[in-house]
Curated annotation (Swiss-Prot):
PANTHER family: 30S RIBOSOMAL PROTEIN S13/40S RIBOSOMAL PROTEIN S18, SMALL RIBOSOMAL SUBUNIT PROTEIN US13M
Record InterPro entries: Rbsml_uS13_C (IPR027437), Ribosomal_uS13 (IPR001892), Ribosomal_uS13-like_H2TH (IPR010979), Ribosomal_uS13_bac-type (IPR019980), Ribosomal_uS13_CS (IPR018269)
GO CC terms of this entry: cytosol; small ribosomal subunit
Functional summary from the UniProt entry: Located at the top of the head of the 30S subunit, it contacts several helices of the 16S rRNA. In the 70S ribosome it contacts the 23S rRNA (bridge B1a) and protein L5 of the 50S subunit (bridge B1b), connecting the 2 subunits; these bridges are implicated in subunit movement. Contacts the tRNAs in the A and P-sites.
Gene3D superfamilies associated with the record: 1.10.8.50, 30s ribosomal protein s13, domain 2
Name of this protein: Small ribosomal subunit protein uS13
Keywords assigned: Ribonucleoprotein, Ribosomal protein, RNA-binding, rRNA-binding, tRNA-binding
Any GO BP: translation
Description of how the protein assembles with itself and partners: Part of the 30S ribosomal subunit. Forms a loose heterodimer with protein S19. Forms two bridges to the 50S subunit in the 70S ribosome.
Region ranges (Disordered): 94-121
Similarity annotation: Belongs to the universal ribosomal protein uS13 family.
Amino acid sequence: MARIAGVDLPNKHVSVALTYIYGISRSSARTICEKARISSACLINDLSQDELAVVRAIIDREYKVEGRLRTEVALNIKRLMDIGCYRGLRHRKGLPVRGQRTRTNARTRKGKRKTVAGKKK
């Protein structure tokens, strides 16, 4: 089992296995395979140590992955909250950020329903 960027990759096609790394999509994985001159249909366990080293070097040099990427995203959200912009306020309140409706739906972002007492007749 190969280990790249602190992630154990399963024995699948290279282009699929690389997507197990946070920050690498299918298209990024294909690009990495092309730059490393590796067939994306090849299995991870079939790669030599030299080929794995080339893939590691490409990822380290050109991509922000795993911890570095998670930290950057968290800092971007924190910056939005600190400057008090609309998106930052929505993050702070735990509401949808990108303009979705909230009268109904938005349960994923808002969490479990809170029961409100009904109006007396």
